Amino acid sequence: PGTNFPIELIYVKKHLVIEVVDAFDNWYKVLDEEGNTGWLHKSLVSSRRYFVVKNDSAKLYKNPKNNIELLFLETGLRGKIESCRNDWCKVKIKKYSGWLQKIDIWGVYQNENF
């Protein structure tokens, strides 16, 4: 990684969902939701967590303990992850807040809690 190498890809999406797979000095090797890998300077990477919906059947629920559905979500929709526990993540999508099942999103490991 470094500034002396050619640029292979330019990201223009806001709140890009990436996985950091390696690190070297001030650089992170990242994997994006489409399977692309490359190096990003750490100043371009935020600790805020975001997700992208990967299943057409994804639903936003009021809470994980009941079946009150708030929204049906389209594949590719993005939002912010506030916390995750067990099989669920508390998320925010624009003005909506609720819970999503981890299996419906890309951006969090299935065994990850925070």
How would you describe each model-predicted region?
Residues 86-88:
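Helix-loop-beta junctions that constitute the ligand-sensing/allosteric loops
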